[in-house]
């Protein structure tokens, strides 16, 4: 018979600061333990935290997550220390839920406890809720000072803070998606065409695109990428794509006017 899973509640669990631990046993004998952790955040009386630890049947920790909710996007060194102790590992993902006065979540920020504790330089991405893709938002670098991290975002969303090394890998892949839809087009004199970028490029990553022509007498291009053929000849139209992280890439399209 299949074990349907069990759960029980333990009162105070010391000395790691965990309280009201709920343990769920899965059919494969793995366990999921969720506990409250008492935290104090200056100027935020409603701040609260919990830790969820998943262990395999042998008792090895396979994942550890903590949720901190309150009115500020602040992680203090003391809170991070408490959460690491409660989880029993530095390999802990902390999800900060920033709420408004009504208690509704404005945005969330996910960050590795290890990266905060060791004051790593971090870059922010927003997670696309439909695709799960990481999208660029700005060129800023965030860094904890003495293990204290303070971040805030104006727009609603799910944000993630990654090390600059991890971010560089994602940014490199995004740069690769910048390409023209067509490398060459033939247009009759007096007619128009358009410089379109490849659909692989997620427009949410783009800050702006500017266009240039190598010979205005042969063809002109406007700010929206619309190309007008003026007289016979060959011309190169360039698109300079600036991403939200400030990085740029120039791609071109060959236009033959007949």
Describe each region flagged by the PLM.
Residues 148-170:
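C-terminal beta-strand-rich structural cap/linker in extracellular carbohydrate-active enzymes
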Residues 93-94, 131-139, 217-220:
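Surface-exposed loop/edge segments in extracytoplasmic proteins
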Residues 126-128, 213:
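Conserved aromatic beta-strand anchor motif in extracellular beta-sandwich/beta-rich domains
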Residues 131-155:
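Short, surface-exposed beta-strand/turn "edge" patches of beta-sheet domains
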Residues 1-123, 130, 162-172:
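Feature for mature exported/ectodomain regions
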Residues 169-258:
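Extracytoplasmic soluble-region selector
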Residues 120, 157, 233-237:
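Exposed beta-strand face motif in extracellular beta-rich ectodomains
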Residues 108-113, 148-154, 224-226:
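Exposed aromatic-hydrophobic patches
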